[in-house]
UniProtKB/Swiss-Prot annotation:
The gene is ilvD. HAMAP family: IlvD (MF_00012). It comes from Syntrophus aciditrophicus (strain SB). Pathway: Amino-acid biosynthesis; L-isoleucine biosynthesis; L-isoleucine from 2-oxobutanoate: step 3/4; Amino-acid biosynthesis; L-valine biosynthesis; L-valine from pyruvate: step 3/4. GO terms for biological process: isoleucine biosynthetic process; L-valine biosynthetic process. InterPro entries: Dihydro-acid_dehy_C (IPR042096), DihydroxyA_deHydtase (IPR004404), DiOHA_6PGluconate_deHydtase_CS (IPR020558), ILV_EDD_C (IPR056740), ILV_EDD_N (IPR000581), IlvD/EDD_N (IPR037237). It is an enzyme of class 4 (lyase). It catalyses: (2R)-2,3-dihydroxy-3-methylbutanoate = 3-methyl-2-oxobutanoate + H2O; (2R,3R)-2,3-dihydroxy-3-methylpentanoate = (S)-3-methyl-2-oxopentanoate + H2O. One of its GO terms (cellular component) is cytosol. This is Dihydroxy-acid dehydratase. Mg(2+) binds at D78, D120, K121, E442. Homodimer.
């Protein structure tokens, strides 16, 4: 066993003595030692209950003859970090989570791992660590929050974000916003729509590293606890057979994950995270692969913010396995891929079926014939940009307008809420990329303000930053190269004409090439922000959004 190097033999008597100081018996020490990575904390609704999930995981490990050893992971709540300096740390925390998990598992050589995340950057951080370490591993998430209810309608966190813009526009009273605030998030779990956390939990299941049901079983359902126990049991089989993450997360498995991403209409953050996770497995996922798979995979679900449904309804409709069963008819699912269940994808899908065709539509009634995400290119984004096309209104799929340029999110929010943005404008927010932000803040506050003020039918937003999974509308992010690297977005001037053509996958700055070259020669980097601490190191090490914003090798 891998753990033998820290517990077996005469010379390891001091090591065993330290285990005994914590109450472990000789029998427990002799068993396979399974690390249980617990991201529980009291600042994220999706993590507030993870201690309970972890206790169930540990029960499963003991049932199967192993010894669980729990250790923590940090976690940032993107919703609470939104719209202020804290958001600079969100994406940056992904690397901290991956690195600190690696450090713990290399310092203490466990035989296997059960990783228990639930929210935005914690899931990809742990996935990166698992593939980097490549010891037997399984994921079980905390599950999604239920949607709230107000006046007989489903509401969620994005309803509250958009409510702020509605109040500013005089379309809602502060009393109505308070009522919404009080009921939109009714309890524990990852926020209830197809936002980044739930997107990544669903991707984990599709990738084969989480059991069927991992992406959708609600946090408060007993089935979630049973799933956690099953994950604890399954890790022991994976350890005994030495089945490792890279045996499961192959190129075929990543293609499966991308196909599910497209069918569901997942968060654009998957375009950052999936390539970063694949990188740890030694697999390069080019952005063009997203468009290739999108062209073959229809969008079957309109989950909040793109539509009225929430993850609890997706679960009741058959979950991720049912979605995979439908799109497998198109040949976009590699059914021979192995999963942590011990079965192949195809074997898992044998019993899957759709129970509600309004939540998971059949192929002949797909919302659109392409997937939920599109990669755009053009003279404004030579290395690519991303849009959640499933959340864009039909009238905004092809759009031209006047550039309104802001060098930070804060400046843009002030202008939007101050009534300075009008129909036909294209809001450009730059110097918010991985290096320039640094940290690539999510632009949920400005996009929610645009939607809440009723401008989402006539105003687009472009940025080298990124978006929350809760963003809807003509919101195009990850523009690469970013402004801080002298990318074309840095050369846009107030009043320039910009053309967006999502069906043609183009993003064009309509400025004469000679003029652009002149501007490029005149461009100077922004003054230093005098960064200190982790953000300073992050800005030095991070690469482009087009490569997943990973660190330089």
């Amino acid at each position: 066993m891998r753990s033998d190097i820290m517990k077996k033999g005469l010379e390891k008597a001091p090591h065993r003595s330290l285990f005994k100081a914590m109450g472990y018996t000789d029998e427990e020490i002799a068993r396979p030692l399974i690390g249980v990575v617990n991201a529980a904390n009291e600042i994220i609704p999706g993590h507030i209950h993870l201690d309970r999930i972890v206790e169930d995981v540990k029960a499963g490990i003991r049932m199967a003859g192993g010894t669980p050893v729990e250790f923590p992971a940090i976690g940032i709540c993107d919703g609470i970090a939104m719209g202020h300096l804290g958001m600079k740390y969100s994406l940056a925390s992904r690397e901290l989570i991956a690195d600190s998990t690696e450090a713990m598992v290399m310092a203490h050589p466990f035989d296997g791992l059960v990783l228990v995340p639930n929210c935005d950057k914690i899931i990809p951080g742990m996935l990166m660590a698992a593939l980097r370490l490549n010891i037997p591993s399984i994921f079980v998430s905390g599950g999604p929050m239920l949607a709230g209810r107000l006046d007989g309608k489903s509401v969620d966190l994005i309803s509250v974000f958009e409510g702020v813009g509605a109040v500013k526009a005089g379309k809602m009273t502060e009393e109505q916003l308070k009522a919404l605030e009080d009921c939109a998030c009714p309890g524990c779990g990852s926020c209830s729509g197809m936002y980044t956390a739930n997107s990544m939990n669903c991707v984990t299941e599709a990738l084969g590293l989480g059991l069927p049901g991992n992406g959708t079983i609600p946090a408060i359902h007993a089935a979630r606890r049973r799933l956690a126990k099953e994950a604890g049991v399954r890790i022991m089989d994976l350890v005994s057979k030495n089945i490792r993450p890279r045996d499961i997360a192959t190129l075929d498995a990543f293609k499966n994950a991308l196909a599910v991403d497209m069918a569901l209409g997942c968060s654009t953050n998957t375009v950052l995270h999936i390539p970063a996770i694949a990188h740890e497995a030694g697999i390069r996922l080019d952005l063009d692969l997203f468009n290739e798979i999108s062209a073959r995979t229809p969008n079957l679900c309109h989950l909040s913010p793109a539509g009225p449904h929430h993850i609890e309804e997706l679960d009741a409709a058959g979950g991720i396995q049912a979605v995979m069963k439908v799109i497998s008819k198109l040949g976009v699912i590699q059914e021979s891929a192995l999963t942590v269940s011990g079965r192949t994808v195809g074997e898992n899908l044998e019993k899957a079926r759709v129970l509600n065709e309004e939540v998971i539509r059949p192929l002949d009634r797909a919302y659109r014939q392409e997937g939920g995400i599109a990669i755009l290119r053009g003279n404004l984004a030579p290395d690519g940009a991303v849009v959640k096309q499933s959340g864009v209104l039909p009238e905004m799929m092809i759009n031209e307008g006047t550039a309104r340029v802001f060098d930070s999110e804060d400046e843009a929010i002030a202008a939007i809420l101050g009534g300075k943005i009008v129909a036909g404008d294209i809001v450009v927010i730059r110097y918010e990329g991985p290096k320039g932000g640094p940290g690539m803040r999510e632009m949920l506050s400005p996009t929610s303000a645009i939607a809440g003020m009723g401008l989402d039918t006539s105003v687009a937003l472009l940025t080298d930053g990124r978006f929350s999974g809760g963003t809807r509308g003509a919101a195009i992010g990850h523009i690469s190269p970013e402004a801080a690297e002298g990318g074309p977005i840095a050369l846009i001037r107030e009043g320039d004409w910009i053309a967006i053509n999502i069906p043609e996958k183009t993003l064009t700055l309509k400025v004469d090439p000679e003029e652009l070259e002149k501007r490029k020669q005149e461009w100077k980097p922004k003054a230093s922000q005098n960064l200190t601490g982790y953000l300073a190191r992050y800005a030095r090490l991070v690469t482009s959004a087009s490569t997943g914003a990973i660190f330089k090798d």
